[in-house]
């Protein structure tokens, strides 16, 4: 349940997010591989088994979870479900085979993880090579972009990132954002590099009065305020702005 998820410690909640995101990002490959290893398909009378196999396989193949830990957790999840308990042995066997068949998962899987209609559109607009490159890029967890109040090089070093030409700090750090240095003191906020450019185009705004219309969730408002502007932020979603500030 959502309440149970929110009650998890930060690190565990971050892992859950990564597992779910990885399953969605690699769903085609996961289902293909599991299908190859299941002689008769997933048990129709225990729908949760497919979910358990998907999350377990994702942990084994793409996350930094030891094979034995992913298998053990998946088996225990099956045992805890009334309808899935009888298939705990199946879960154990399939996931052990997954751990031994990693190469199968990485064999030309780009098309499997991309909706056919989308791949066709990309191919039509950009050509087959570029379409394939886009699909491959979509298979990777994106970088995290941060806008910092000041001293971008210092914060880039602290979060193990780099400063982009736009001034954004980009890092490949994964896990709970709240655990990164600078989060508690509000030294930075998450904002895509492209989203930060419009406010930077104003140049020196120190002492100027700026109206930020349609301001939620507040990233550009925070940028302008940090740069010394007197900002009036307006939006129907005021709660989102207040949360950001």
Task: Locate predicted features.
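S-adenosylmethionine
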Residues: 1-245
